[in-house]
Amino acid sequence: SKELNKAIVSDVVGKIGIEDLKVILSQADEAMREVREFEKQIRTFIRTLEEICNENGLNASSYVYAAVSGGKFSITNAEKKCRIFKNKAGKEELLSGLYEKLNHYYERYYVKCKKSYLLYNSIYKLCLLVFIANRKQDLLKEDNGFLLRDTQKLLNAMVTSEDVVPFIYEKIGSRIRNIMIDEFQDTSSQAWYNFMFLLKECLASGGSCAVFGDVKQSIYRWNDGDWRILKDLYDGNAKKKYSISTIGKSLSDNYRTDAEIVNFNNDLFSQAFKRLGIDIDKQTPKRNIGKGELRFRFTNTTKETSEREGEKSNLKNSDLEMEATRAEIDYYLDNGYELDDMVLLFRHKSKLQMFAEYLKECDNAGLHDHKYNPCSNEAFLLKTSEEVKKIVFILRFIADKKDTIAKYWLEKIAGIGELDKLNEYKTETVSLIDLVLRIIKDFDVNAQDVFVLAFCDKLAKYCSGRSNGLDDFIRHWNDTMSQETVIISKEKNSLELQTIHKSKGLEYDVVIIPFCDWFFVDNRHDVWFETPEKGSAVGIFPSGLKPLHEVDDKYEQMVEQEEYLQRVDNLNLLYVAFTRPKHCLSVVCKEPTVNENSKNGFPQS
């Protein structure tokens, strides 16, 4: 969700100039003064009540909520309902007057101050984006350049209405007789607005147009894809914005997946989408009727800890899920499948990387019946390679002989006992690349290792046009290069690991989905929203979802719409993952609790 609404952000930021920023900053300064005054007054109310309680032998904690005792009130965590004084304070003769004054003051100023805080608290993020956008435009003007990703925006500015179709569109429409657009569920509203007039011109000239897509496979909203365009077209809703008259046809035959998996997906997703107000067409299985294997493994930390007597009780759900996933791989290997027949699909790249390292450790330890030989274009970080670590720690020790961590790793982990000879290395008279090549030669680093080769390639790019200073490179390694991935090409009899996004359109005999317990609504990251306030110069603002529930109806509707779209996004991801297998589907996740959070009958995770 960190990348949601990029088009909105880009559009608004691109229209804000330096003079506009001055107005915005002036509004922000005034608004935040009001917020601070509101917080100050609430804290004064709290301290006054506590003083009255102390003077009259009353226990202040009986009348003030613990979260704000001692005047700890902040608008950041404040809710629409006043939770400062407890109702008991209103019934105490000494406190009732103060209780009424506080509630009246809170009710009068809370909503206004909460709005101001949400709009202006992160104003410097907006200023930074505006500065970057203006600097980008200056650089493009200097180079007489144009970014290809801005093409849609440029066309959008030209195509202002149906009555003003540009000359080139008329010419193209008269020549193209048939138009087909595939994967239409990932089309952005901006792109569709540009194409729509071309399609209308084509149809008016006697041609034909067809769009293909599946709203259930729309998983690129973070890249401005909007499944609602396809849904409106399929429903024949020509009155909706950006729509035209259509005839919808469902292609329901499934020739990929065994019947039992198709039937399961029909039952699961028809109910799940129905709860979101979306009716979907069920698929008709055309392959291996009565066949197909579905497996679910649930992990429970509490149960597992109690059953493993004598072991440490610091088990994590992630550890158990990795063990359970490995057991699923073993199950299929024991039943005649090869590693080449399988794929592991992950919602998050971080989980993919963690599991890839786990499998590598299993292979290196040699304690299991099978070798897993994991491969992925997304999993393996440079910093995870022992050979690369050796190079980097040697560089660190050369740069600073007092680096005890580097010294310990080289001596105890890598088993290098002759660190004194590193004193002979003269970094002032040799380039960084030559220094690394000498390290590879002198310390028996495997020069053919794929990680070492990737490290050398990235080092060469770094050194091109930059300082060869060792300290600068170590900073670059810590900040950036250590997090870069290495593509491990698929070899014969290797296990492929992918994110769900990368697996779209592909098929596999066996699909295993570890960590299948992600949140359907993400409250961890801020989302950029358009400002609903007419008098504000701020066009957009970032906010978490929860605070928006605590303002008024306009903000409530805004956040409910975002939560709804996130549920659809994550359900679509689940659908894409569950429809990749041909014969077998395995799901691994933590055991859901009885009181799992849900909203409108739909689970949060």
Where are these regions (language model features)?
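Conserved ATP-driven helicase/translocase motor core recognized via long
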Residues: 1-145, 592-605
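Conserved motor-region signature of P-loop NTPase helicases/translocases
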Residues: 3, 7, 11, 15, ...
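Conserved helicase/translocase P-loop NTPase motor core
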Residues: 45, 125-178, 190-194, 325-328, ...
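Active-site-adjacent bridging/hinge elements
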Residues: 107, 126-130, 203-209, 488, ...
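Short glycine/proline-rich turn/loop motifs
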Residues: 109-116, 132-138, 142, 247, ...
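Metal-dependent DNA phosphodiester-chemistry modules and their immediately adjacent helices/loops
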Residues: 385-423, 543
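C-terminal accessory regions
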Residues: 418-433, 443, 491-495, 547-604
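Conserved catalytic motifs of ABC-family nucleotide-binding domains
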Residues: 523-564
